[in-house]
């Protein structure tokens, strides 16, 4: 995801830095690419597709130690992007395709579909880090 976090947002995320409540491993569906997805709450609105403009709330953790590295909720501002346009990590483009407005999902993304060998030091994401996200799809247009 090509979003930066301010020092304030990182401090807010650190305050809520606790292990996320995740579904059991066997509840996740696995994609061919290695992404794991669990639908926490199905939505009933419009379905996302390539080119959809999506507004979400999300929280992101390092899979290794569950350290939260970013949260739109902590910023009190939803994140908006266009699906399938490369404006977010490829794991998001894949995992959020076909999801309905109102859906809450948990996503486990391997490093190769996140920030890979580079990581994002400004966000506290080391190289080769698998990531975990909780995403709520607020609006699809």
Indicate residue ranges for each PLM-predicted region:
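Cross-family detector of peptidyl-prolyl cis-trans isomerase
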Residues: 1-141
């Amino acid at each position: 995801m090509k979003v930066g976090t301010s020092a304030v947002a990182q401090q807010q995320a650190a305050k809520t830095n606790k292990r996320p409540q995740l579904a059991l491993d066997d509840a996740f569906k696995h994609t061919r690419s290695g992404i794991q997805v669990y639908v926490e709450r199905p939505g009933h609105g419009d379905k996302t597709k390539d080119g959809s403009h999506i507004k979400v709330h999300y929280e992101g953790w390092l899979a290794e130690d569950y350290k939260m590295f970013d949260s739109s909720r902590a910023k009190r501002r939803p994140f908006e992007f266009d699906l399938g346009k490369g404006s977010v990590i490829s794991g998001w483009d894949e995992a959020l395709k076909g999801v309905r407005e109102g859906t809450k999902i948990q996503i486990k993304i391997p490093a190769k579909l996140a920030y890979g060998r580079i990581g994002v030091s400004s966000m506290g994401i080391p190289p080769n880090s698998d990531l975990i996200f909780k995403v709520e799809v607020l609006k699809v247009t």
